[in-house]
Design a protein with these regions (language model features):
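Short conserved micro-motifs on helix faces and helix-strand junctions that flank
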Residues: 10, 71-72, 124, 133
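Membrane-embedded alpha-helical segments of multi-pass membrane proteins
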Residues: 11-15, 41, 134-141
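Generic detector of intrinsically disordered, low-complexity, polar/charged segments
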Residues: 13-14, 33, 155, 165
């Protein structure tokens, strides 16, 4: 059961954010409703994981005997995931208004949501390989947020961000 508690908060926003990029929302209200529900569900799933998950590890993938993708809930991951799960919905509410005048909102909201899942992956990382993988994925998931206006200046900033982060 720990596997579900640890993977659902990560994969719900990952899949939801990527699929939502393909959806053409008929109105701003419907877009906000979709992302609001998705992010609040992810926060609820995260808090459920924090409260119900034991300290056992869950192995997602085994490459070799020593190299595995492992998720684990411990004290630090509870703190970090709890902060993310609490603050992300408030950030979303702020961004609804802050980003209202911008273009490329489908890209912004998709990657904003994906970033939530990847952040939780960093929180639940059970070993250094898993943390490194999710850290690099976080760099890639936030790159479109840095480049969001898609202006020449934003693209140059995105290249710098990618070079410094990788």
């Amino acid at each position: 059961m720990n596997g579900l508690y640890l993977t659902l908060p990560i994969f719900l926003p990952l899949v939801g954010g990527l699929v939502s990029y393909l959806i053409r929302f008929p109105s701003t209200r419907s877009r906000h409703l979709f992302y609001g529900v998705l992010i609040c569900l992810t926060s609820a799933a995260t808090w459920l994981s924090i409260l119900r998950c034991g300290s056992e590890s869950f192995q997602l993938l085994r490459f070799t005997e020593e190299l595995t993708l492992t998720l684990r809930m411990d004290g630090a991951s509870r703190l970090f995931a709890g902060l993310a799960a609490t603050l992300w919905p408030f950030t979303m509410l702020y961004a609804f208004d802050y980003m209202s005048h911008e273009k490329h909102l489908s890209m912004f909201w998709s990657f904003f949501t994906v970033s939530f899942g990847v952040t939780l992956g960093v929180a639940f990382a059970g070993n250094m390989m898993t943390m490194y993988l999710f850290y690099e994925l976080l760099t890639l998931a936030t790159l479109p947020l840095v480049m969001q206006p898609m202006s020449t200046t934003a693209r140059k900033a995105g290249v710098k961000y990618a070079v410094y982060s990788m």
